[in-house]
């Protein structure tokens, strides 16, 4: 049976008590689901560099057996506007974040306290350009430990800690902690709802030879209206020395950016 992100989010928001993952019965596919959506995005004062532009995002995720997946593909400057801040920049950016359930792999319930499930977590980031022709090419692989944690009011929050391997430099460069959440908090009679959704990506322990700041990150705070097929939202994103770039007059990397989105769900 097809389960949408909407259904899972509502379940997470309304179920009491919330049970830990239990695969001791051998049925690793009982929690399977999948979802996909397209987001037409507008970004304003995005950091670093205070860029304003449009882009189309294909966003997807799901669960199949012991594997959990989230990812997206962004395509920038859809109309190829010569006045866009993205002119001359890579056209595409991709992020894939597969996780493998340790609970599902071992068939054991490894939950403790608010931690519901443990994962081997990975994250891959690419912009599709060649490092030989673009010194700022993105080619990062990250691996570490992941978890689903029950947090008061928020419900289930994904928490992952990675070590960062920079593929272009062929070297490890610090760590990243990432969290994400989706919390419906106001419901309408027609079944639509308003959610608070977002994430934190914070990098630390970065090497001086690759970064002008040893730590930095970003936090996205989105307020979205959702129906079964559509969503409309606004996001405020806060930055602090993002990507390890020290904030300066020459390149602003600390501050706030704004995002608007219109979504169609498949």
Curated annotation (Swiss-Prot):
Source organism, top-level taxon: Bacteria
Transferase is among the record's keywords: no
Entry annotated with the keyword Phosphoprotein: no
Predominant place of localization: membrane
Keyword annotations from UniProtKB, A to Z: Cell outer membrane, Membrane, Signal
One cellular component (GO) term of this entry: cell outer membrane
Organism phylogeny: Bacteria, Pseudomonadati, Pseudomonadota, Gammaproteobacteria, Vibrionales
InterPro entries xref list: Channel_Tsx (IPR003055), Channel_Tsx-like (IPR018013), Channel_Tsx-like_sf (IPR036777)
Name the UniProt record assigns to this protein: Outer membrane protein OmpK
GO MF term (any one): nucleoside transmembrane transporter activity
Database matches in Pfam families: Channel_Tsx (PF03502)
Function, as annotated: Serves as receptor for a broad-host-range vibriophage, KVP40.
Annotated family: Belongs to the nucleoside-specific channel-forming outer membrane porin (Tsx) (TC 1.B.10) family.
Gene: ompK
Subcellular location field: Cell outer membrane
